[in-house]
Amino acid sequence: YEIRLSLVGSEMCIRDRPWAAYLLSALPFFTLALASYYKVQLRGDPVLATDLRLIRTAGGIMGNYTFEISAPVIVVLEGFVLMLVLSCLMLRKERMSPRSRLAGIMLMLSVTLACYFELYTSSSIYKETANNDLISPWSAVEVYISRGTTYPFLHSVQDMFPEPPEGYRESEAKQILEQYADTDIPDDQKITVVGIMLEAFSDLSDFPQLNEISAVRNLYEPLHELESRSVSGNLLTNIFAGGTTNTEWGFLTGYSQHEEFRGPINSYVRYFKDQGYDALYRHPGYSWFYNRSNVNEYLGFDECVFNESGFGDLISIEDALFKSDTVLVDYLLNDIDSRTEDDDSLFLFSVSYQNHGPYSSETYWEEYVTPAKTGWSMESCCVINNYLAGIRSTIEQMRRLTRELEARDEPIVLVLFGDHKPWMGNGSSVYAEMGVDLDVSTQEGFYNYFSTPYLIYANKAAKESLGQDFRGDGGDISPCFLMDKLFFECGWTGDGFMQLQRETRAVTPLMHEDGYRMVDGSITLDVPPDVAEICRRYLCAQYYREQHFVSES
């Protein structure tokens, strides 16, 4: 309220018009409230200050969603208009001298700045405003909403700027990393590495409600067969129903937490390049989405192909939502086959676009669930059927890819993983109707909310070249540990940071942004002191590596 009153006062001093002061002061907060409301409905998380960096990305996908004008929105709209009318009719226009006007503006600015830096950024005050008796303290969304919209948004502004982990000392972090020497990939083991992050890829047969349906079990059976011939497990992501680059960049950098990168960054892409690899990136979507065109350059990729620079000639962006995996697999195979013996080794990474939400709730093209069989609404059944139809196609194409790789004499290892659970209705309505537990304070709810599949597959030539079996349970890990897991299965040591990761992963394979760790197989926020110290050292070393770019290893 202090900030809002200061803005109103400033506008009064500038314009002498109460209605204009109200309108220009209320409109930003009204817009923020609506944006946060709909983001929670569509994505399951509120608007934070860091989202301002992604306004263009958000604008590009808004047309895909349906914005329901609900009763709360109508009430807020009516209140906004009513207050504007009252300010026009009941508040008098006051003339002010230039000196009074300037003094008023300076006073309001002083109040605004004082309130922000003394109150809104205070962690202690923020903790004191907790409403844990009324909400689930483990739900970041409920914690945010319980404080309104303006206050938590302004409090999040400081998160736009990097803040070191608790107990961070640069000299200590540097010393931690210096304990590990970078190790090269042996020349005779520099095989082709292919990585594919699959859009909203999730094994919904993990839910008993769907696993008891034979059509759903049959759909996922080819995936399970492929997993049985690979190293496989669950990826415990930081995100739900969106925010795909969190998982993507976690894999490519090894960082357990990160924002959008703004300059050259140490990454595993650069490690591959230092080892003499060519690093290529492929995505059938737009390059501006999540600012990938710039970020991929910061990560160190040699070449990137997006919709605008290649895929658009093969498939329209509209069709890419439904059937671009076939095109993507063909493109990747061509990348592999066009190499010659004189070319460098290849790191080929791609992000799929097929099956990006939302999914239609009005009609469907393939039938897996029906209201008659499940008791669920037709709208929910449509969403589920349309999602599963896309998954069926994706699984078919990934199996085709593995067959093609197996037929080649070139040694190739492939890592597949999902970025996040799929969108399933505004406010996760479809999950709720199915009875899926999304309470992350429980082990079951945490997995239901955050887990996606991953697998590491190698063709016969790669198994022979590396002397590894590439089969078995890979365990459940955070995205930041997936590249390390890939290197471990290949028998490679990796750089110094990866070696630190491997030691940390042995203690807790989960490094979640919200502080969750996995200790002796249990997910917990109550971390034993010895594990907490290992995590602190890891986070400090990670922060140091992120902040100190080294162009060449």
Where do the language-model regions lie?
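Extended, compositionally biased low-complexity polar/Lys-Gly-rich tracts
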Residues: S6, V75-G79, V351-S352, D484
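Single conserved hydrophobic/aromatic residue that forms the stacking wall/gate
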Residues: Y1-G9, I14
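N-terminal secretory/membrane-targeting segments
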Residues: S25-K190, I213-V231, R262-V269, R392, ...
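Membrane-interfacial loop-to-transmembrane alpha-helix junctions, especially the N-terminal start
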Residues: R17-S25
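Solvent-exposed soluble domains appended to multi-pass membrane proteins
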Residues: E178-D188, G195-L198, D203-S553
